[in-house]
Curated annotation (Swiss-Prot):
Keywords: Hydrolase, Polyamine biosynthesis. Homodimer. It comes from Pseudomonas savastanoi pv. phaseolicola (strain 1448A / Race 6). Belongs to the agmatine deiminase family. It comes from the Bacteria. GO terms for biological process: putrescine biosynthetic process from arginine. The keyword Membrane does not apply. This is Agmatine deiminase. The keyword Cytoplasm does not apply.
Length: 368
């Protein structure tokens, strides 16, 4: 594998928008019993449904441990899904995996961020995370992609969204958290994002969704749907703890221009629930010191914004909530050229994330 000493920007590479043509989507098989209830079996069923939904539109590669390989291979029984044996600590490939970058000639490379399980020993969600730290380089090696390495700079893919035209959206709650890069200032973080993703403007929203255990990842709160247009998780209920967060984000977006000088068009996506885990669901999770506790009194950070754009499709979570159909209708209106597929999201939410968190798109190479 080739490790480059330059930066993507210096080499003419940038992170494309999620709606750019893709060659495949990466996923990782869930099995961690101190995060996924009942040994991960319900979450595995949800993963199968999501992988098969994506495979209708493009290829999927699922990384799975040696212990679960036969099970995963048997259940992911469609030709468009490849299963590869790969060790990991958990299934959050959006955050532990690489970020792919592309140049004008269509060449694809990868950025291998440093990963510390969302905070390391200062609020992180599990330890150890050494296998997850290797995941990005393993994916890039399988794909024969040259890689850039950001030693000393922690970043998760779910903490950023880009429009492919120079603008990145993130949250202060995550990127300025003391458990990520306390040695860096906001300006230094912006400079690194500029070097490795080739963005010219960083839009800082104050917070992500309430109780998001990743410290407010933007991919659960606000995402691009096309250049200059975003979809923001929203509530009109002033008693909802998300109310102030949504309105603060809207205030920033309404008073900010993007890298191209455009004012943002903001669409509002209703938040489901409030949603909570049941006592039975929490009891199915192994209680291990150092791992995130599951408690039925803690509100879950459910969000329809946590969807994935694929070639011709939108794969979005459903929660058996009255708001599910409204979310589907809004997404179909916003993406008229795509087919919206709602996939089971509750088991993923119980584990701390959702469809976007558990997937990583790989852009398609092309010739200029």
């Amino acid at each position: 594998m080739t490790t480059l000493n330059s930066t993507p920007r210096a080499d003419g590479f940038h992170m494309p928008a999620e709606w750019a043509p893709q060659t495949q989507v990466w996923m990782v098989w869930p099995e961690r019993p101190d995060n996924w209830r009942l040994g991960g079996k319900p979450a595995q069923a949800a993963h199968v449904a999501i992988a098969k939904a994506i495979a209708r539109f493009e290829p999927v590669t699922v990384a799975v441990s040696a212990a679960q390989y036969d099970n995963a291979r048997a259940r992911l029984d469609v030709p468009n899904i490849r299963v590869v044996e790969m060790s990991s600590n958990d299934a959050w490939v959006r955050d532990s995996g690489p970020t792919f970058v592309i140049n004008e000639r269509g060449e694809v490379r990868g950025v291998n961020w440093e990963f510390n399980a969302w905070g390391g020993f200062d609020g992180g969600l599990y330890a150890p995370w050494n296998l997850d730290s290797q995941l990005g380089s393993k994916v890039l090696e399988i794909e024969r992609c040259p890689r850039y390495v950001t030693k000393g700079f922690v970043l998760e893919g779910g903490s950023i969204h880009v429009d492919g035209e120079g603008t990145l959206i993130t949250t202060e709650e995550c990127l300025l958290n003391r458990n990520r890069n306390p040695h860096l200032t906001r300006e230094q973080i912006e400079a690194i994002l500029g070097d490795y993703l080739a963005v010219d403007k960083v839009v800082w929203l104050p917070d992500g969704l309430f109780n998001d255990e990743t410290d407010g990842h933007v991919d659960n709160f606000c995402c691009y749907i096309r250049p200059g247009e975003v979809l923001l998780a929203w509530t009109d209920d002033p008693e909802d703890p998300n109310y102030s967060r949504c309105h603060a984000a809207l205030g920033i977006l309404e008073n900010t221009l993007d890298a191209k000088g455009r004012a943002f068009i903001v669409h509002k996506m209703p938040i489901p629930g409030p949603l909570f885990a049941t006592e039975e669901e929490c009891a199915g999770v192994d209680q291990v010191h150092g791992s995130q506790e599951r408690n039925p009194s803690v509100r879950l950070a459910g969000s329809y914004v946590n969807f994935l754009i694929v070639n011709g499709g939108i794969i979005a979570p459903s929660f058996d909530d009255p708001m599910d159909e409204k979310a589907r209708e809004l997404l179909q209106t916003l993406f008229p050229e795509h087919e919206v597929v709602m996939a089971p999201g509750r088991e993923l939410l119980l584990g701390g994330g959702n469809i976007h968190c558990l997937t990583q798109q790989q852009p398609a190479p092309h010739k200029a």
